[in-house]
Amino acid sequence: MTDKRKDGSGKLLYCSFCGKSQHEVRKLIAGPSVYICDECVDLCNDIIREEIKELVPHRERNALPTPHEIRQHLDDYVIGQETAKKVLAVAVYNHYKRLRNGDTSNGVELGKSNILLIGPTGSGKTLLAETLARYLDVPFTMADATTLTEAGYVGEDVENIIQKLLQKCDYDVQKAQRGIVYIDEIDKISRKSDNPSITRDVSGEGVQQALLKLIEGTIAAVPPQGGRKHPQQEFLQVDTSKILFICGGAFAGLDKVIGQRLNTSTGIGFSAKVKGESEKATEGELLAQAEPEDLIKFGLIPEFIGRLPVVATLSELSEEALIQILKEPKNALTKQYQALFNLEGVDLEFRSEALTAIAKKAMVRKTGARGLRSIVEGALLDTMYDLPSMENVGKVVVDESVVNGQSAPLLIYSKPDAQVSGE
């Protein structure tokens, strides 16, 4: 490599590609009788990157996984929710098959199938969407429906969702149009009341109306910097009909709406059949019977429900399922903490009764799988604080008493004569 000096013969050196002298560039790289400057190297890299981007969609189309393959991958990361995984696998496969073959097949227009996930907090709605996007290697972004408002009001515009998706793929419109958008807390934008009000519902029905076109498919004009504060900027045109929208929510109280409908259909008065405690359906069983009319009664407008034709319900996770979640998935929580401790050169062991205690705590808190990390973090906090300052610790053992806060983890030292229990 040469610097900005003449060579041994006193001759001024020039880039063989752009013709700039060594005084006009930062570096010249020498080859056999040729030179290339740093600017030309950067330009070559940009050209190669652009060509690779053009090849990616073709490669993705040829590698579209089958519903069985999608389901198998979800099984590696998500415990339970078998029906929801099957529904998602088919819907995602059909969506990307539609993109691969265009919007029509033999003259038949293929409709867009967005997805609605209904299930309690911590049941795996967000994890399913994230895992799908990661497996398919497509851009993914999340939005919180509670922060969205109608255009012109304080809050996020619905177009900001697409702007976030563009950010995830460096404003590559073609790549963004193959992405997945997950809108969480969709139940929180339900209509506040069935009765018309003088006060405009800018965060409820108004947001549903604003989301309609975006979810169904429209050409969204999105500024690179987001918002409407810079109208002079050139807007990016994004076709949202190619983006898969997955909406999720807990829909607290929907089970009661469904229960009322089912009870009404069994008769009233003396002809009504009174069910015993053993015959009463669980919340998960009721949610699985959700119909569009129930969602309308809950507060979603009919047009919005029509844009989400694929509905999958997730049941509340049992204690056994939570124990499986702790130890079985590829990125299970216990495996994550074991990897963290291994970075300190220490083994970490969770005894079976400890996993049961963690699951029981999560059940009491009603936080589902989402609450598992905070419980494990609380049990290991003091140990993780002290461990980097300690020497000769070879293993840390967590049992039920540690999870319940009755004792500290058992520390096993690498020296045989130095085994102690927690302080």
Curated annotation (Swiss-Prot):
Residue positions binding ATP: P120, T121, G122, S123, G124, K125, T126, L127
GO process terms (BP): cell division; proteolysis involved in protein catabolic process
Origin: domain of life: Bacteria
GO CC term, one of those recorded: HslUV protease complex
GO molecular function annotations of the record: ATP binding; ATP hydrolysis activity; ATP-dependent protein folding chaperone; protein dimerization activity; unfolded protein binding; zinc ion binding
ClpX-type ZB domain boundaries: 2-56
InterPro entries per UniProt: AAA+_ATPase, ATP-dep_Clp_protease_ClpX, ATPase_AAA_core, Clp_ATPase_C, Clp_protease_ATP-bd_su_ClpX, ClpX_bact, P-loop_NTPase, Znf_CppX_C4
UniProt-annotated binding residues for Zn(2+): C15, C18, C37, C40
Keywords per UniProt: ATP-binding, Chaperone, Metal-binding, Nucleotide-binding, Zinc
PROSITE patterns in the cross-refs: CLPX_ZB (PS51902)
NCBIfam families, alphabetized: clpX, PRK05342.1
Cited function: ATP-dependent specificity component of the Clp protease. It directs the protease to specific substrates. Can perform chaperone functions in the absence of ClpP.
Name used for this protein in its record: ATP-dependent Clp protease ATP-binding subunit ClpX
Organism of origin: Photorhabdus laumondii subsp. laumondii (strain DSM 15139 / CIP 105565 / TT01)
Upper classification of the organism: Bacteria, Pseudomonadati, Pseudomonadota, Gammaproteobacteria, Enterobacterales
